[in-house]
Design a protein with these regions (language model features):
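Periplasm-facing N-terminal accessory domains of Gram-negative outer-membrane beta-barrel systems
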Residues: 2-6, 13-141, 160
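Periplasmic N-terminal accessory/gating domains of Gram-negative outer-membrane beta-barrel systems
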Residues: 89-247, 266, 273-284, 288-297, ...
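Hydrophobic, lipid-facing positions within transmembrane beta-strands of outer-membrane proteins
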Residues: 180, 211, 237-239, 289-293, ...
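Transmembrane beta-barrel wall of Gram-negative outer-membrane proteins
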Residues: 253, 283-364, 385-413, 578
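Gram-negative outer-membrane beta-barrel transporters
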Residues: 544, 682-830
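C-terminal beta-signal and adjacent terminal beta-strands/loops
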Residues: 678, 691-692, 696, 812-845, ...
Length: 926
């Protein structure tokens, strides 16, 4: 069965099983509690009404059950008033209840005897502790997004969340043109999930952890970051970023936001010790700006709302230690334009629809190529990124059926088309050269890429809700395809060592690959309130099928035209993931909770894992190169063809029949306590263990085909055993995707968090201490050279982290705010490149090995403090807020990337934390 045919069948089955899409469950909140009379007895039959301007329908209602319990689900974030009424009793109204995303606010009430028209109104603080939910999350509402200085991007904002680590820290929006990976509590690089209003908008290509889209800050009402004990509707365990969009409203409102900086507004943080390491010029800002306009309101009050926003932002940065042919420092120049329109329709009282269209265009003048990773690039060897088509389209429906049934449905699509073309100034006949010792690329980009993809999400859920029990069942279907087409100058890559000819790669371009995937999930999530205990058991089933459709490639320099048959169902995973969360309201007062859980998650996967099995994929031979005339241009007569290794035509790969989907078990336990009226603290333990990790091995060359050879380890002054491949296996390739049971990774950590809101101030923050240790799983481990020192610190291990932010309203409408990011630097590797000059007769020609375990060396401590000062001017309903931001207040210059190859350039930085940056701007709102 083809993937396309399978997709249609799955969608049909999903439609029959449930009414509609489900990830939206992660977007919504709830209000729950118990109603009693003045003697303490429970009151059944009480009508409970939640009202908010955030609801286009205005109000949502429920009735207490025989235990006096009620629960109102599927509420949007906002400020609510809750009214309790029962004949023979005075009505009670609680006002000013702030409800963030994915939070259950416990609002209890006591009714006294009296006439119904007699009422008691109470204005009080919102609950700070969710005593029913077991999910760990942090919410950045619109006030925080506007107040705390960040790069106005979900990834930059996420760097303020306790426990979250990333490879490159953002300084004042200088890194928001890319999408860095976020990890939390030892999660995988793959396990980032992006949701728009609760609907997953993930790219099915690459590793599955990208969106292929850049987000408009003006669209966001708030952003929720869920990090542990996730429910069954969550696809994986890691950082779940849920972006809640504005819905418009019954009044017209809008904003204009402008901010920017240039190179004269940044401090010099190039120190002498960095210069001594060979860092001649630091990475720094050339110019950065952000313009964001929003407008929302009613088309028809209480019936149809609209919200639109346009954003144009740019970050042009000078690259560290990278120069043009004229000696000028190279610039990474880029900008993004985005326009979004959103409609919310209340068709009938119990049926709501939302329509969302978001178009984004990115241009990047000098992007590093996608094939070779190097610390230094001649700008002429970069690529130009241009966008042909990139948008998000989403339709969502939700319905309240009586007092106990809720249904939701959504469909999402994301096409991605962009080109990574050669730099226009590159010489016509130039070919790419890679110096493996200096870690530098020159001449021209190694290749040009044409990328295209289509993604679709269909999902649905039905919820049954009573006061003490709720059950949700649903389905999620994620399907699509991803394709890359490759071309190269001369179909060759020249490799040098410190400027001396070493070898060449003869490449089978024009080539490429296209893969398809269908990921289907069924889930059930239960929640039982049993006295002071709430149990949240869940079960998730997933089926993931990956295929390679039929495809072809034209003739190249070294290869003829080629046609390849389809390979259907290469991967066919069926997994079951149980999850159990709990929460104990210790004193039954909604202020103290002990919570935690045990959860199994599949690892998020993209179709990239079957690319090595695609016969059209890029492949090459590595051949010795003897540059006899010394011109550093490889002629055919200088290529020693008899000693080539590898293959120009990938042999048909295989998937081990026993291949398992990688998964993880997560263990959490934490104590949360509200102290006084305004402060909540928590302390928790987080554990994670990965299993069933896989890699692609060359089964044609087993580990027994290697002979040990002893060489000197230049770092330890001891011997190091490396392995020489049997010449009889030269050129033999049979890739097999296989699970290696001996591979594992695990994390253990503790975390303290504080969240305070006062009349004039707010503060949030956390301290995380943890260690992420295990095996790397990215190489052919049939080759024993890749097992050398393979166990060490993994991922973005950062032993100590401090994250936080604050805001304080000074007299005269002056707002002072800031944030802090302190962290241990990430672990480094030390790579020894073994060549024939070290081991004469080395069959592989070149072999990389780790001289020491990853983490024996590490990057330095990062200390980032950002501040913002805002003055508010008001005139009628309009506010003008000029803004002054200072990022990296202490001018930290911690190295974030450096040459890790042993040689003359070892330790030479290629990037550091950007220096102190001042940005000025302002906001007009009405």
């Amino acid at each position: 069965m083809t993937t396309s045919g399978f997709t249609h069948r799955i969608v049909l089955v999903a439609t029959l099983l449930t009414i509609a899409p489900a990830p939206s469950a992660l977007a919504q909140s709830a209000i729950a509690g118990v109603v009693r009379d003045s003697s303490g007895g429970v009151l059944p039959g009480v009508s409970v009404e939640a009202a908010s301007a955030a609801l286009i329908e205005g109000t949502r209602t429920a009735v207490t059950d025989t235990a006096g319990s009620y629960k109102i689900e599927n509420l949007r974030p906002g400020v609510y008033a809750v009214t309790f009424t029962l004949t023979g009793f005075r009505s009670v109204k609680r006002e000013g209840i702030g409800l963030p995303t994915s939070f259950t606010a416990t609002i209890n009430a006591e009714l006294s005897l009296g006439q119904l028209q007699e009422s008691v109104t109470v204005t009080g603080e919102s609950p700070l502790v969710d005593v029913r939910g077991s999910v760990s999350q942090s919410v950045m509402n619109r006030e925080r997004l506007d107040t705390i200085p960040t790069g106005k991007d979900p990834f930059a904002v996420g760097q303020l969340i306790a426990g979250v680590t990333t490879q490159t820290p953002d300084v004042g929006g200088t890194q928001v043109m890319q999408q860095p990976t976020l990890q939390v509590h030892g999660s995988s690089n793959n396990d980032n999930v992006f949701m728009l209003d609760g609907v997953q908008i993930q790219h099915i290509g690459f590793g599955g952890n990208q969106t292929g889209f850049y987000f408009n800050d003006g669209l966001m009402e708030e952003i929720g970051y869920q990090t542990s004990s996730l429910p069954a509707e969550a696809p994986v365990g890691g950082v779940q970023i849920n972006m809640i969009p504005h819905d418009g409203g019954n009044t017209y409102h809008g904003t204009v936001f402008i901010t920017g900086a240039n190179d004269r507004m940044q401090a010099d943080n190039l120190s002498q010790n960095l210069v001594d390491l060979g860092f001649r010029k630091q990475n720094r800002v050339q110019s950065v700006y952000d313009v964001n306009v929003t407008l929302g309101g009613p088309v028809r009050r209480d019936r149809l709302w609209f919200f639109g926003t346009f954003r144009r932002w740019s970050a042009n940065n000078f690259l560290g230690n990278t120069f043009t042919s004229t000696g000028e420092q190279a610039v990474d120049d880029q900008h993004i334009s985005d326009a979004t329109i959103r409609f919310t329709l209340q068709a009938k009282k119990n049926n709501k629809f939302s329509f969302h269209y978001d178009r984004s265009i990115k241009w990047r003048g000098h992007r590093p190529n996608n094939w070779l990773t190097a610390s230094l690039n001649d700008p002429i060897s970069d690529v130009v990124q241009t966008t042909q088509l990139n948008y998000i389209g989403e339709i969502k429906w939700s319905s309240t059926i009586g007092n106990r049934l809720l249904a939701e449905a959504a469909m999402f699509t994301l096409p991605v088309n962009y080109t990574l073309g050669f730099e226009p100034d590159a010489a016509g006949g130039a070919v790419a050269t890679f110096d493996q010792i200096r870690s530098a690329i020159s001449g021209v980009s190694p290749r040009m890429d044409t990328n295209s993809a289509r993604m679709f999400t269909y999902a649905g859920n039905v919820s049954y809700v009573t006061g003490s029990h709720s059950l949700k069942v649903g389905t999620q279907v994620r399907t699509g395809w991803s394709q890359e087409l490759f071309t190269m100058r001369g179909d060759i890559l020249q490799i040098t060592s410190n400027g001396v000819a070493n070898s060449v790669r003869l490449v089978n371009t024009p080539s490429g690959h296209k893969e398809e995937g269908v990921n289907t999930a069924l889930f059930a999530q239960d929640s039982w309130r049993l006295g002071r205990w709430t149990l949240n058991p869940g079960l998730r089933y997933e089926k993931y099928v990956m295929s390679i459709p039929a495809q072809s490639a034209p003739a190249g320099t070294w290869t003829p035209a080629r046609d390849f048959a389809a390979q259907n169902g290469i991967v066919n995973w069926n997994t079951v993931s149980p999850r159990l969360g709990f929460s104990w309201d210790v004193f039954d007062d909604g202020r103290t909770a002990v919570k935690g859980g045990v959860s199994r998650y599949d690892r998020l996967e993209g179709v990239a894992i079957i690319q090595p099995l695609n016969q059209r994929n890029i492949s090459f031979q590595t051949c010795p190169w003897s540059d006899t005339n010394g011109d550093l241009i490889a002629q055919n007569s200088e290529i020693v063809s008899a000693r080539c290794t590898g293959s120009l035509q990938p042999t048909l790969g295989n998937v081990d029949p026993g291949l398992k989907r990688p998964h993880q078990w997560e263990y959490t336990a934490l104590l949360q306590r509200q102290i006084g009226r305004f402060t909540a603290v928590s302390v928790g333990y987080y554990g994670r263990r990965f299993a069933d990790l896989y890699t692609t091995v060359n089964a044609a060359v087993p580990s027994t085909a290697y002979t040990p050879v002893t060489i000197a380890n230049p770092l330890t002054n001891q011997t190091l055993t490396i392995y020489n491949q049997d010449p009889a296996t030269r050129g033999a390739v049979r890739n097999v995707l296989t699970t290696l049971p001996e591979l594992e990774q695990h994390y253990n950590g503790v975390e303290l968090q504080v969240n305070t809101r006062l009349n004039r101030a707010t503060m949030f923050g956390g301290l995380t201490i943890g260690r992420d240790y295990g095996d790397q799983d990215s190489n052919d481990l049939n080759n024993p050279n890749f097992r050398i020192n393979n166990t060490g610190l993994v991922g973005f291990d950062s032993t100590y982290q401090v994250r936080g932010g604050f805001s304080y309203r000074l007299p005269a409408d002056v707002q002072f705010s800031g944030s802090i990011r302190e962290a241990t630097g990430l672990p480094q590797m030390r790579i020894l490149i073994v060549t024939t000059s070290i081991v004469p007769g080395l069959t592989q020609v070149t072999q990389n090995v780790q001289a020491v375990p990853r983490g024996d060396y590490g990057y330095p401590w990062q200390n980032l403090v950002d501040l913002r000062l805002v003055k508010v001017f008001k005139s009628g309903g309009t506010k003008f807020e000029p803004t002054l931001d200072v990022y990296n207040l202490f001018n930290n210059n911690a190295v974030t990337n450096a040459v890790t190859t042993i040689g003359s350039s070892l330790g030479r930085p290629s990037a550091i934390v950007m220096g102190t940056l001042v940005r000025v701007g302002g906001r007009i709102s009405f």
